Design a protein with these regions (language model features):
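DNA polymerase processivity clamps
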Residues: 1-144
């Protein structure tokens, strides 16, 4: 994955006026524009600090992660539903977690696209006690 594409992916995240992120409890996960994924970023592993290294492993699904983080794979599960009270989309995972997605992110989706995140137990090798996970990037899937 070249630097130009990385800049494109992170464009919405580096602009403080465009809050394209989701929150899981108190942990911040970032939503990447144009791609369906969630990334757990530790405060000490800020990907926007110059000099931080990233890598992508294209294996059907690109996995983007900070080389400096001791990460494990986790693919979140659920599908988008509407939560009118919070005026955001809610991703409810099979294990009961709720992930709230800021409406600003929906600007990156076309009318013909629906964001889906799936859980594949075979993809989950381990989850450390501190909860550091590797990002999993999946293409947006058409709802047709």
């Amino acid at each position: 994955m070249n630097k130009k594409l990385l800049r494109h992916i992170f464009k919405g995240l580096t602009n403080p006026n465009n809050k394209s992120y989701i929150k899981v409890d108190k942990d911040i996960h970032y939503i990447m524009p144009d791609m369906a994924c969630a990334v757990r970023i530790e405060a000490t592993d800020n990907p926007f600090v110059p000099g931080k290294a990233f890598n992508a492993a294209p294996e059907g699904v690109d996995r983007l992660f900070n080389k400096g983080a001791d990460a494990v794979k986790l693919l979140l599960t659920g599908e988008l539903t509407v939560d009118g009270w919070r005026d955001v989309r809610t991703l409810r995972s099979k294990d009961g977690r709720e992930i709230y997605i800021d409406n600003n992110y929906l600007n990156f989706l076309s009318d013909e696209q629906q964001l889906l995140l799936y859980l594949d137990d075979k993809s989950v090798k381990a989850i450390r006690d501190d909860g550091i996970v590797e990002a999993v990037i999946a293409p947006l899937r058409s709802k047709h």
